C-alpha cells in the first residue's frame, strides 16, 4: 500500500529517535551496572529493549507503506559521565522525541493515516512514561540528595 510521503518522513524521524535511544540507553545500562547501580541498570536496559520494539514497529509500518526505513541515520548519542548526567541526557533525548511524535500525530491525522497515528500515539504514551520516571529520579536526587538516591539504586 503506497503511503503518504509526509507520514513516511515522520516515521523515519521517529525511527531516528528510537535508534539513537536504543544505543544511548543500552550503553547507559552497562555503565550503571559497571558502577554498581544494578536497579538503574536493569531499568535502563528494559528501556533500550522497549525502544527496539518501537523501532521494529516503525520499520514494519514504513515497509508496509512502501517506504524505505532509514536505519543509518541517528542523532549524536549523548553519554553522561555519572548517573545523574546520564539521566539528564536521556531526558533531553525523550523531550526531542515527544516534540517529533506530537507533530507526527497531527499530520497523520490530517492525512487520514489512522494506523500510523495510532502507532505514533502508542509510542508517545510509552515515551511520556519514561519521561515521568526520569523526572521522578531527578526529583528524588533533589529531595534526598545524590548520595542517598544512588544508594537506593544499588
Task: Identify the residue ranges that each predicted region occupies.
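Iron-associated oxidoreductase/ferritin-like identity signal
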Residues: 1-154
Amino acid at each position: 500500500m503506497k503511503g503518504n510521503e509526509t507520514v513516511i518522513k515522520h516515521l523515519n524521524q521517529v525511527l531516528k529517535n528510537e535508534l539513537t535511544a536504543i544505543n544511548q540507553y543500552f550503553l547507559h545500562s552497562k555503565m550503571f551496572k559497571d558502577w554498581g547501580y544494578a536497579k538503574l541498570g536493569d531499568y535502563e536496559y528494559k528501556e533500550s529493549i522497549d525502544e527496539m520494539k518501537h523501532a521494529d514497529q516503525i520499520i514494519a509500518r514504513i515497509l508496509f507503506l512502501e517506504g524505505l526505513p532509514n536505519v543509518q541515520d541517528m542523532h549524536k548519542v549523548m553519554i553522561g559521565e555519572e548517573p545523574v548526567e546520564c539521566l539528564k541526557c536521556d531526558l533531553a533525548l525523550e523531550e526531542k522525541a515527544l516534540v517529533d511524535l506530537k507533530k507526527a500525530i497531527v499530520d497523520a491525522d490530517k492525512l487520514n493515516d489512522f494506523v500510523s497515528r495510532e502507532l505514533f500515539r502508542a509510542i508517545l504514551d510509552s515515551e511520556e512514561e519514561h519521561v515521568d520516571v526520569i523526572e521522578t529520579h531527578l526529583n528524588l536526587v533533589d529531595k534526598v540528595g545524590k548520595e542517598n538516591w544512588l544508594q537506593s539504586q544499588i
